[in-house]
Amino acid sequence: MNIAFAAADGVTLNGQIIAAKQPKAVVLLNPGTATKTSFYLPFAHFLAEHGYTVMLWNYRGFGESRTRSLKGSDICFADIGQKDIPAAIAKAKTLHPQLPLYCVGHSAGGQQIGFAHNCNELDGLIGIAVSTGYFGSMPMGYRIKAHLFFKVISPISSALFGYVKAEKLNLMEDLPPKLAKEWGRWCANKDFFFSEKFSKEKPELACYRTFNFPVQVFTADDDEISTVSNTKSLWKHIKSTKPIEFKWYKASDMPKKSVGHFGYFRKSNELIWQDVLDRLNRFSA
């Protein structure tokens, strides 16, 4: 079932509900930045088949929520957490108000949870590849590609076209110019948006120290972005009254010997899906 809901500033966000026959909880599935929701559908159906109604959606300017031209758009990276995720949490709460609400956040979808003023309405968070994106802690080959994208391709494309034409390069979905610039600036700092460099402009960070729900973080050792260093750099700033647990996968243990930053959601790594399901069940226990 397709859904539409509005952020506090009136921007319409779109998504879909993958309903469980007899739901025991609702899962808000937050995608990574500039990633089509269709990529997550097999995983969402897996959760629904095991009793979790899933709300899969996308951020302003991306996928089904790209409702206007990105040329000259004023969308910022922090809008994901400040404006869009709060609206998604509120919408998800209406689906089955009597049931627990969990979030599975991929990359920025978990990283920016603490920007949401209502994040403590969640009953649990599973963060998949949730870390900083610091260039300096990426493998050298990937680091060079990231620098090339953010420091060359992105500004040139923004100057020529008014937005970042990333989709034509088969990199990701197109990016609003301000979002790409802010994202790149964060990635240039080891502490990401926690850096004092952004103290006058960054969103309110207090919620990151007052989580009131359990957290499980899943990361693979071949993830080019969520490296061990980048993962620790983010989570050292985050506090919860409930446990924050980590599981580190060895890519060599996976059927195709690969996970990377996106492979967690590929059916070939269904072992990870089962671990997510087991953790959701423990949240519910």
Ranges and model annotations:
Residues T37-L70:
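Conserved alpha/beta-hydrolase
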Residues E245-A285:
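Catalytic active-site module of serine/aspartate enzymes centered on a nucleophile-bearing elbow/loop
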Residues K24, P31-T35, D221:
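Active-site glycine-rich loops that stabilize anionic/oxyanionic intermediates
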Residues M1-A19:
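N-terminal cap/lid segment of alpha/beta-hydrolase-fold proteins
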Residues F211, V217-T219, D223:
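Short beta-strand/loop motif that positions the catalytic acidic residue
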Residues V104-D191:
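Alpha/beta-hydrolase-fold enzymes
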Residues F213, T227-H237:
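Short alpha-helix in the alpha/beta-hydrolase fold that links the catalytic acid
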Residues D74-L95:
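Alpha/beta-hydrolase active-site loop
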